[in-house]
Amino acid sequence: NFGIKYSWEENKIKILPQTYKETSFKVESDWSGASYWFSLLACADSGTFFLEGLKENSLQGDSKIVEIMSHLGIKSTFKNGGVLLQKQQVSGLESWDFTHCPDLAQTLAVTCAILGQNSIFTGLESLRIKETDRIHALQQELAKFNAELKEIKPDVFQVIPSVTMPKQVQIHTYEDHRMAMAFMPLATKTEVFFEDPAVVNKSYPSFWKHCNLAGISTEKIA
């Protein structure tokens, strides 16, 4: 509370000139960034993660990752100021509407493709006007490990999972930080080369360092 008074009527917020009051507050951790660790654990054979600074009743739309991943083998327990992730049986993700959490779509497309889930995705309209056309980018890169994101009717997409995994995959990141991070869990199944890995610096500069801490070996190639 910074001491600012306002009025809110229908879709209008009125704030008169005022002086802010200094206060201290704690910023919640980023659920978008957390989603990649949900995905990594879902694709891994074993393990647990504890993610600090995440709240159970978050206002962030991407906190929906908890519910989504409960269908893909991740049990979430909120405790000690964060969330403990543990593996559980995959029940299956039949469909999901990403209208209110579009930044999760790339992560879930890759996860479903790796886990053998034929899932239906809707609410992806905004993905075409993000850092890149993320629909096109996903289709191009999923194909590299024999998976698909197929538009079965206007704005309705089906993830068709990979049946065979190549020994190596080279991922083009399209100057899009989320393309690099979303495809990182593929490293649990095969060797992955990322073009322009520094693209993650836009939102998560320590991403590759945290991958190392999570057991993913990385090497810079000239």
Give, region by region, the residue ranges found by the protein language model.
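Short, structured segments at the rim of ligand-binding sites
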Residues: 1-222
